[in-house]
């Protein structure tokens, strides 16, 4: 069986216009996949140079396959049908190592055609490293490496205004573009680089914050033989991902034209502020996950897919989203409804087995950040507690009992909550506290909730009633009126 290379699999080789820091599965199934589509259907004509930003030779370089690899996109399409689509990605020209090929790395700045810089160097990648110096070959941190590369470009082109870059980080931190820009400016200042360089950084370059959304499941280890047989070639860089994707870029509107998004309408939004889109994702996608987990698990289910194929639990989740989460969010209703429909479809993806217990990790913090804002906003707007989000809080407290049908299961949270719940449920079992006292103890933890939730009118009483129903009637019976 042949291995992918450009001799045996000839095709277009695009001029290098994109630098990408990061060789991992996510960028290959997200950025490079989109660039490949744009190259095929528009005149973007952009080749990608992947820069490996760390000192590691594992996995092997993409250059061993001349940059070629296959994506397999799997999930439910817009019609709810299970689909699996393979695509040979040709957008990556080569990979270089910033550690083994530092001179080659700096030479990228001399290419007049380079216009875009994408990155995913993990959440810790956009950070300050005190020891980084201008003459390091290379510096340790990604922002320092980028600063050195930008200065190389500034120097080579004598500060030409038309040689700046559009810098689009994909790291999962809030306002990643602004954070990266601040660090680049910090290094420029600490390294005493010319004031003209700082001016050029500000005037000729655009740092864009982003929100990225796609579940990338990566190399399909258990299915490789079967997939390669159907493809007809060996591919050491096979990359699998879900059907859904969303790319929100906070940047100038001319960016849509530069990326040729006016010619191929991908699911990419160029917006003035990513904040409402971040809030939408956290509230609907992450919030629904967090509400679902304790309810579904205590109802006897083990995966998200099982839960969404269960009529009762699915109805609970959908009504929580549409009746209690969406009404308090600050985006057009039709956009929120469309996103919510996509979320439900993603939860049903038969190709992804999401274990409820793995999503349950740090559930107390997740509830505070993902659900509590909508619960409190709903109570403030409507004057009544949103019943499903309130029930989800009761279910969460029941979940931290650590027992389902007489059997234990592992709980994963910070040590404070694990110890506190063990103490409270032991006291309840000994009848030394009432159920209401247990609920009050949880809701009054101001250090965690950043407020005393027993002060929210009716909340402690309703959580106690819901918790009593879960414990005495079972989850199925307790949740039924809310489905």
Swiss-Prot record:
Any Gene Ontology biological process: D-galacturonate catabolic process
Keyword NAD: yes
Molecular-function GO term, any one: mannitol-1-phosphate 5-dehydrogenase activity
Record-given protein name: Altronate oxidoreductase
Entry annotated with the keyword Nuclease: no
Gene3D superfamilies given in the database record: N-(1-d-carboxylethyl)-l-norvaline Dehydrogenase, domain 2, NAD(P)-binding Rossmann-like Domain
UniProt similarity note: Belongs to the mannitol dehydrogenase family. UxaB subfamily.
Catalyzed chemical reaction(s): D-altronate + NAD(+) = keto-D-tagaturonate + NADH + H(+)
């Amino acid at each position: 069986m042949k291995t992918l290379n450009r001799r045996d699999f000839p095709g277009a080789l695009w001029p290098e216009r994109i630098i990408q820091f990061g060789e991992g599965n996510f960028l290959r199934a997200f950025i490079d996949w989109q660039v490949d589509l744009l190259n095929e259907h528009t005149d973007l004509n952009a080749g990608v140079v992947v820069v490996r930003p760390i000192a590691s030779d594992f996995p092997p370089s993409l250059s061993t396959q001349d940059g070629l690899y296959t994506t397999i996109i799997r999930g439910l399409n817009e019609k709810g049908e299970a689909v699996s689509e393979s695509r040979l990605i040709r957008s990556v020209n080569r990979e270089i190592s910033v550690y083994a090929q530092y001179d080659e790395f700096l030479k990228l700045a001399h290419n007049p055609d380079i216009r875009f810089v994408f990155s995913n160097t993990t959440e810790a990648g956009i950070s300050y490293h005190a020891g980084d110096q201008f003459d390091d070959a290379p510096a340790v941190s990604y922002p320092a490496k980028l600063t050195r590369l930008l200065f190389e470009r500034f120097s080579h082109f004598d500060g030409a205004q038309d040689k700046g870059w559009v810098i689009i980080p994909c790291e999962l931190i809030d306002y990643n573009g602004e954070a990266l820009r601040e660090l680049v400016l910090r290094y420029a200042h600490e390294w005493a680089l010319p004031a003209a360089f700082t001016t050029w950084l500000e005037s000729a370059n655009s740092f864009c914050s982003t929100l990225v959304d796609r579940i990338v499941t990566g190399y399909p280890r258990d299915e490789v033989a079967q997939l390669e047989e159907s493809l007809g070639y060996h591919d050491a860089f096979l990359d699998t991902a879900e059907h859904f994707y969303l790319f929100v870029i906070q940047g100038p509107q001319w960016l849509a034209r530069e990326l040729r998004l006016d010619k191929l309408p991908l699911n990419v939004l160029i917006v003035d502020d990513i904040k409402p889109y971040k809030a939408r994702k956290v509230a609907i996608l992450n919030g629904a996950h967090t509400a679902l987990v304790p309810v579904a698990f205590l109802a006897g289910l083990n995966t998200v897919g099982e839960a969404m194929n269960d009529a009762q639990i699915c109805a609970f989740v959908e009504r929580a989203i549409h009746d209690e989460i969406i009404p308090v969010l600050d985006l057009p209703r039709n956009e929120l409804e469309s996103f919510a429909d996509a979320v439900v479809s993603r939860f049903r993806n038969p190709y992804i087995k999401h274990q409820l217990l793995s999503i349950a990790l740090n559930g107390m913090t997740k509830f505070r950040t993902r659900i509590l804002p909508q619960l409190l906003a709903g109570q403030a707007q409507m004057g009544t507690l949103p019943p499903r989000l309130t029930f989800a809080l009761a279910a969460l407290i029941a979940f931290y009992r650590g027992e389902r049908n007489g059997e234990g299961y592992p709980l994963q949270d910070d040590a404070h909550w694990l110890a506190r719940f063990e103490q409270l449920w032991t006291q309840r079992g000994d009848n030394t506290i009432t159920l209401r006292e247990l609920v009050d103890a949880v809701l009054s933890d101001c250090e965690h909730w950043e407020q005393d939730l027993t002060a929210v009118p009716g909340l402690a009483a309703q959580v106690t009633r819901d918790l009593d129903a879960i414990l005495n009637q079972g989850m199925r019976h307790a949740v039924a009126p809310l489905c």
